[in-house]
Regions:
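Alpha/beta-hydrolase superfamily serine-hydrolase fold, recognizing
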Residues: 1-166
Length: 166
């Protein structure tokens, strides 16, 4: 079982993409939440025109750009290990069953959900849900939506742990 929030979700996706041919990891499932999947796009450009007019969202996106620059460093941002949305279907088809949660009030929402859809199209069993009232980091910061998400985590992990023990 693998799990990651935000950049950690990106790392989980990268590990699974890298492992698509070798199959050394063999996780029973993966939990990925509100994570960046396309680091080729400037976060400010991801904002809708309405959000681009809102100083709060622009500042958040500018901060996200700083994080992205630190995270990507000298790597090619189009590399699927950096931008999982760019992975080929064969790599995505090797993913285990996934629970993917997006935050309704997060600039990464659209990308996270697009990645979930790519996995579904690759034949992966995916449970994806947008937590409407949630902001980025809601599960770790215990902000609106975190309790519901925690229940989803527990249910998902229990199902897979029981399957592994059967």
């Amino acid at each position: 079982m693998l799990a990651g929030h935000s950049a950690g979700g990106n790392l989980v996706a990268a590990a699974l993409i890298k492992d698509a041919e070798a199959h050394h990891l063999k996780p029973c499932c993966a939990l990925l939440e509100y994570f960046p999947v396309d680091n080729t796009v400037d976060p400010v450009n991801r904002l809708s025109p309405e959000l681009q007019a809102n100083e709060f969202w622009v500042k958040r996106a500018q901060t996200e750009k700083l994080y992205t620059d630190f995270y990507v460093g000298d790597a090619d941002p189009a590399d699927p290990l950096c931008s999982p949305l760019k992975a080929d279907e064969t790599a995505l088809a090797a993913f285990p069953e996934c629970l993917i949660l997006s935050a309704g009030e997060d600039s990464l929402r659209e990308d996270t959900e697009a990645f979930a859809l790519r996995l579904v199209k690759a034949g992966v069993c995916v449970t994806a849900q947008r937590i409407l009232e949630a902001m980025h980091g809601f599960t770790t910061n215990r902000t609106p939506g975190w309790e519901y998400a925690l229940k989803k985590h527990i249910q998902f992990f229990r199902e897979h742990l029981q399957e592994d023990n059967s």
